Amino acid sequence: MEKLRSNNGGKNIIADQLKALRNQCGLSQRDLAGKLQLAGLNFDKNIITRIETSNRFVNDFELKSLSNYFGVSYSYLLDGIPTSEDLEKYPDLLPL
């Protein structure tokens, strides 16, 4: 059975949100991968690149890990609409 795809044919729906968060933190893809690895998560630069270009599926554990690392809601990562708590931490987040 083929896996579902996003409306634009991508393999995930968090690509734009992950890139926006990473950029707001002033991190390169390599920097983010290193920080996630230090937190005990199995991410490398290529994984970050593939997620941000919608060329990789993201599982629930990875979604939770990214949400926890950045301190944002699942709904922001999934829907691109920041909650008031997300905006307190990242005031420049715009709905994507």
Annotate the PLM regions.
Residues L18, L32-A33, I48-I51, L77:
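Conserved hydrophobic/aromatic packing and binding residues within compact polymer-binding modules
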Residues M1-C25:
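A short, Lys/Arg-rich alpha-helix, primarily the initiator
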Residues N55, N59-Y76:
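DNA major-groove recognition helix of helix-turn-helix/homeodomain DNA-binding modules
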Residues D16-Q37, P91:
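Short basic helix-loop element that most often maps to the first helix and adjoining turn
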Residues N23, Q37-L38, T53, K64, ...:
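Residue-level detection of the helix-turn-helix DNA-binding "recognition helix"
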Residues Q37-V58:
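Recognition helix of helix-turn-helix/homeodomain-like DNA-binding domains
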Residues E2-N8, N68, L78-L96:
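Short, charged recognition helix plus adjacent turn
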